[in-house]
């Protein structure tokens, strides 16, 4: 690691105030189009004659399609253009989101959901790569955490919006209205306001551009050279990160897709009320994401921050069902569970972005996201199957999802020496430390 005297002081805010907000908006709409099926289940189940297991499969098959472009998406973002790749995929996912309103049977539903997964699949690793081109390592957990607020923001918007649409329309209306957003909002913002690198952005000041490029150049100069993508597949660190991410996605997506059903079972009421209550846990999640990411960047203990947040989420999830008869307490515990199940994100991806040489980061993050997101298929499907098997009880589902979160945390803590890279403390005015601090 270069001496701290060579590390430039942070300059400018455009990367925080322009790039990240646009990326958030794009992924909010993406996340909305993949998870609004949770609100459609009630009406769709009646129209298409589906049981809970079939609904879980329809929700989860998205993640099988999601595999297809993960590694290519990250690789193309690194070697070609994140802006162009994501811009094209926004238009393709919009087509399949809109077509969801017109399915006439279960087979068509599975096909459309699968293709929606294919279309959205490469966007996540591509945006991760884009952020790595704009933020030095010492800012990256905060940058990833800030961007990943999109998941909580999407839920806050999707839940009441979907509930409101269902008060005057049906599940087809839900897909029609929300399927327009990729064309109306996401694509124009992305194509007009995003640049692949600071050197291509006219809206970045010279000082900020020099700070970013100088910082990244010095980090990349210290990085080991790479012989090819095969190194990603040979890395035990990458495969453990895949396992961690799989366990997390089982827990998170199992909770996220079944949350509207859990809330409706707990409190009853109209779709509008269910939507409003379902959104409330994500306010906690936004706070958890920012606090955990900021603390992780400050200490450099990324693995520990992942484990602690997942443990909190797992315990709170089981308690929320155990105390389901006390509605206010149950909703509060669900909120804590959602915060824990999301707050891992910034520290996790900060670790992943540093686990391999810079040239392979896109492919590595694509592999982690691709195979890890199979948990997004398993969680909803297993959750639905367990509810059918237990006569509609969510307790067994909650226990399985919580155990999965705990397992993710336990595997992550074994990576603390490999994935927690040295971090550089920003210079304190008037004081230049002798060397950067290394934290484990």
Each language-model region and where it sits:
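Extracytoplasmic gate region of multi-pass secondary transporters
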Residues: 37-38, 233-290, 345, 349, ...
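Helix-breaking motifs and short loop linkers at transmembrane-helix boundaries and internal kinks
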Residues: 49, 81, 102-108, 119, ...
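Conserved MFS/SLC helix-loop-helix module at the cytosolic interface between two early adjacent transmembrane helices
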Residues: 68-107
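Cytoplasmic membrane-interface "Motif A"-like loop-to-helix N-cap segments
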Residues: 79-90, 297-310
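Cytoplasmic helix-loop-helix junction between adjacent transmembrane helices
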Residues: 112-150
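Helix-loop-helix hairpin linking two adjacent transmembrane segments in secondary transporters
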Residues: 147-201
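C-terminal transmembrane helical hairpin of 12-TM major facilitator-type secondary transporters
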Residues: 302-351
